[in-house]
Amino acid sequence: MDIRAAEISAILKDQIKNFGQEAEVTEVGQVLSVGDGIARVYGLDNVLAGEMVEFENGTRGMALNLETDNVGIVIFGADREIKEGQTVKRTRSIVDTPVGKGLLGRVVDALGNPIDGKGPIQATERKRVDVKAPGIIPRKSVNEPMATGLKAIDALIPVGRGQRELIIGDRQTGKTAIALDTILNQKPLNVEGAPEGQKLYCVYVAVGQKRSTVAQFVKVLEEQGALEYSIVVAATASDPAPMQYIAPFTGCTMGEYFRDNGMHAVIIYDDLSKQAVAYRQMSLLLRRPPGREAYPGDVFYLHSRLLERAAKLNEDHGSGSLTALPIIETQANDVSAYIPTNVISITDGQIFLETDLFFQGIRPAVNVGLSVSRVGSSAQTKAMKKVAGKIKGELAQYREMAAFAQFGSDLDASTQRLLNRGSRLTELLKQPQFSPLKMEEQVVVIYAGVNGYLDALPVAKVRSFEDGLLSLLRGKESAILDAIRTSRDLSDDTAAKLKAVIESYAKTFA
């Protein structure tokens, strides 16, 4: 066997040339102190604001305070396992979350990890949780309705796709119930094979709620067949403050996927008061200076940058939309507190719920006088505009008169008539939970109310009159509902037919 020296040297040279020194360079720091879910770390000089870092035991955190000699990190998890002197390494990625249709029907935590025991998430894309809102040029004014299925809201405080409508009220006034009914009302739009432009996907973000409450909510969605077009993001009361702070942003990013791909979504933040409290806790522990009510100075920016991401995009950007329904809990109906006034000024209107109305049996307990929708009326259908214009005026007069009527017993006939009509319209706007009405059904019911067909009835009979009329129109006279649904208008011809049907029904009902 002949071994040539030249060959050997050539092979050696080649191997030396191709010798790759695989070295992983990671930037690490050291934990200086840890406590209350906050870690102070020394040595992460190049860390980015909002970057994910990893502790020795695999717990993750987010760098929030970048100071001269150390970094303040909020911990996404328990801080019991983290000790002084442990190493922390950079991940070189800003906090992100999985997005896409693979999340529909799932319950995830604030970082997008599944918590429903149904296996891993089938999502290929990941997006940053905190991104800049769309500018002015890609936007379009709100022009399509986002139906909630509730007469009181769709007629008087209409919400459009791409709008931000605040739901505000004390505890136990039915805020979450309105949100739940809105999700259930989208079921007919999300049927299999429906065009994407019609569908409305739902994202529900639970912040600081009891686990039992969230489980109950998910159970209702499942039973009603609404979970398949919904995503639930849960950061419960037992989760650390950073999770409660980041959850709304995570949910928003999931909703933005639909908005940016020419689809439509609605996101419900339940509720932002608890997110503000979590943010206040983090800020104070990071030793940021407190402001009014001990909230940090940038708590307005916290909510504005979140809610500005809800938008209706124009045709050049796919015509998608993201509607936001933030919920705020007030203390003793105090709308002038810091967080409520902030969010009222950011949103395009508010639905104000009152405890007194709730206990009077007016449910949904919407105070029609204080509630407004600043942009929704341009999204209302023509049919609804025609009937709802009257009901607004009648109810406003009724509220004014009812206040005066308490003082005097001898009222003239016109005032008496106004009070009678008002009390029946108020009764008409009541609606039990889980029974949303389609737009055309709301139109015919309100038409009957504003045209005086309920005036002769006792108030207690209004509900049964409404139910009977609707079952008649859904059955024998379904052509009227079909005409309103297809034209989205109440033509003179349809109105005449409707009038005849209501009149004949009123005679038999009496």
Swiss-Prot record:
- What keywords were assigned to this record? ATP synthesis, ATP-binding, Cell inner membrane, Cell membrane, CF(1), Hydrogen ion transport, Ion transport, Membrane, Nucleotide-binding, Translocase, Transport
Q: Sorted alphabetically, which Gene3D superfamilies does this protein's record hold?
A: 2.40.30.20, ATP synthase alpha/beta chain, C-terminal domain (1.20.150.20), P-loop containing nucleotide triphosphate hydrolases (3.40.50.300)
Q: Does the keyword Ion transport apply?
A: yes
Catalysed reaction(s)? Answer: ATP + H2O + 4 H(+)(in) = ADP + phosphate + 5 H(+)(out)
Any matching Pfam family: ATP-synt_ab_N
Primary site of residence: membrane
* Topology in the lipid bilayer: Peripheral membrane protein
Superkingdom in the source lineage: Bacteria
Task: Please tell me whether the keyword DNA repair is annotated for this protein.
Answer: no
Q: Where is this site: Required for activity?
A: S371
MF (Gene Ontology) = ADP binding; ATP binding; proton-transporting ATP synthase activity, rotational mechanism
Q: State the family it belongs to.
A: Belongs to the ATPase alpha/beta chains family.
The family database entries (NCBIfam families) matched by this protein are listed as: atpA, PRK13343.1
Q: Provide the protein name.
A: ATP synthase subunit alpha
Name of the encoding gene: atpA
